[in-house]
Design a protein with these regions (language model features):
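Generic cytosolic/nucleocytoplasmic N-terminal low-complexity/intrinsically disordered segments
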Residues: 2-3, 17, 41, 64, ...
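Sec-dependent N-terminal signal peptides
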Residues: 4-15
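Short coil/turn segments at secondary-structure boundaries
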Residues: 3-4, 79
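Secondary-structure junction/capping motif
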Residues: 14, 29, 49-50, 119, ...
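Alpha-helical cap/lid subdomain in secreted, periplasmic
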Residues: 55-157
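Serine-esterase "nucleophile elbow" of acetyl-processing enzymes
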Residues: 18-65
Length: 157
């Protein structure tokens, strides 16, 4: 009985460890900030990449958590917020993770980001992990606060 209980507990720990390691961060050179917040995740990055770049990459399936970070470069390439949002949904659908997260900018940053974030907050399938960012100046992402800027695309991607 004790041996069976030990095996069950060991199995739970292995399952939790595997789930933590079954996360993938994709994006540009800024992915290091997310890596700080999600230390067990694997990383794929290409400097200067946009969400459109990742749409053309062969997807990796069976991922529990997919974190997408391309917003800065999408803005540099003048991709409109609505297009960026719809492309992130396409990317989530193509890669089929259990949970899909995208890094979102703070509210009081560049005006394009403000407009973009406000548009996203109205989407029914977006859940913010933390919107209490009013005290941040928005000009710099501190590496230990990246986790505050995720939004999660849920269900209907």
């Amino acid at each position: 009985m004790i041996k069976k209980l030990f095996i069950i507990i060991l199995g739970l720990f292995i399952g939790i460890a595997n789930a933590a390691n079954n996360s993938l961060i994709i994006g540009d050179s800024h992915v290091g900030g997310i890596k700080w917040a999600v230390p067990n995740a694997n990383v794929m990055y290409k400097n200067g990449s946009t969400v459109n770049y990742w749409l053309n990459v062969k997807p990796i399936h069976n991922i529990d958590n997919l974190y997408i970070m391309t917003g800065t470069n999408d803005y540099r390439h003048n991709i409109a917020p609505k297009s960026w949002y719809s492309n992130t949904q396409k990317l989530c659908k193509k890669w089929k993770p259990k949970h899909c997260y995208v890094v979102a900018p703070p509210r009081n940053s560049d005006w394009r980001y403000v407009k973009y974030r406000e548009e996203l907050m109205d989407k029914p399938n977006v859940r913010w992990t933390n919107t209490n960012d009013k005290t941040r100046d928005g000009t710099h992402f501190y590496r230990n606060t990246y986790k505050d800027f995720y939004y999660q695309i849920i269900n209907n991607y």
